[in-house]
Amino acid sequence: MKKPIEFYLSGDRVYSTREKAINQLYNNRGYGELKGDKLFLSLIEAAYLTEKGWIKVVDKDKELKFDDLMKLGKSRDEDFDIKYIVYKDLRDRGYIVKSALKFGSHYRVYRKDAEHSDWLIWVLRENQRLSPNDITARARVAHGVRKNMVLAIVDEDGDVVYYKVEWIKF
């Protein structure tokens, strides 16, 4: 994209009414959520697209840079940084990444042009504790909605390792 598309901060999201945003980002690349004539992006999507130079975010006539969006995200979610690392890794690999809060996970991940997601991603820090009940509950939900449960573990260097968790019925 040549000139960044302008988006406006609105609470914990950003939006644009520009047709270019809707066509290039939503229709062609699977970013955001379309509501009426507005394309809404999460802060993580906005940070990613700002870092790539595809959009610019404005709040009260002030442009928010990538670091500003990361700081804003971190102020609202202490795990924003690691969620961003995983989001960026998956997007850079060519996947479509959407929220999976209604499934009790962080992300739903789609192959490009797929109608349904294949994976539910739960993001964790390397030293974060996770109980067997947490793992079982997430694997059970994923199995129930015909998705693969994946734990995305982020180490202190920002590297991500993915572990598939399966529900096996004997």
Curated annotation (Swiss-Prot):
Name the UniProt key words of this record, in alphabetical order.
Lyase, tRNA processing
- GO molecular function annotation: lyase activity; nucleic acid binding; tRNA-intron endonuclease activity
Q: Which reaction does it catalyse?
A: pretRNA = a 3'-half-tRNA molecule with a 5'-OH end + a 5'-half-tRNA molecule with a 2',3'-cyclic phosphate end + an intron with a 2',3'-cyclic phosphate and a 5'-hydroxyl terminus
Q: Does the keyword Lyase apply?
A: yes
**Active-site residues per Swiss-Prot or TrEMBL entry:** Y110, H116, K147
The UniProt function text for this chain reads:
Endonuclease that removes tRNA introns. Cleaves pre-tRNA at the 5'- and 3'-splice sites to release the intron. The products are an intron and two tRNA half-molecules bearing 2',3' cyclic phosphate and 5'-OH termini. Recognizes a pseudosymmetric substrate in which 2 bulged loops of 3 bases are separated by a stem of 4 bp.
Per the record, the gene is: endA
Matching SUPFAM superfamilies, A to Z? tRNA-intron endonuclease catalytic domain-like (SSF53032), tRNA-intron endonuclease N-terminal domain-like (SSF55267)
| Keyword tRNA processing found | yes
How this chain assembles, per its entry, is:
Homotetramer; although the tetramer contains four active sites, only two participate in the cleavage. Therefore, it should be considered as a dimer of dimers.
Q: What is this protein called?
A: tRNA-splicing endonuclease
Matching entries from InterPro entries are given as:
tRNA_endonuc-like_dom_sf, tRNA_intron_Endo_cat-like_sf, tRNA_intron_Endonuc_cat-like, tRNA_intron_Endonuc_N, tRNA_intron_Endonuc_N_sf, tRNA_splic, tRNA_splic_arch_short
- Organism the protein comes from: Pyrococcus horikoshii (strain ATCC 700860 / DSM 12428 / JCM 9974 / NBRC 100139 / OT-3)
Q: Name one GO biological process term.
A: tRNA-type intron splice site recognition and cleavage
The organism's taxonomy opens as: Archaea, Methanobacteriati, Methanobacteriota, Thermococci, Thermococcales
Q: What class of enzyme is it?
A: lyase
Q: Where is the signal peptide?
A: none
EC identifiers of the protein: 4.6.1.16
* Family classification: Belongs to the tRNA-intron endonuclease family. Archaeal short subfamily.
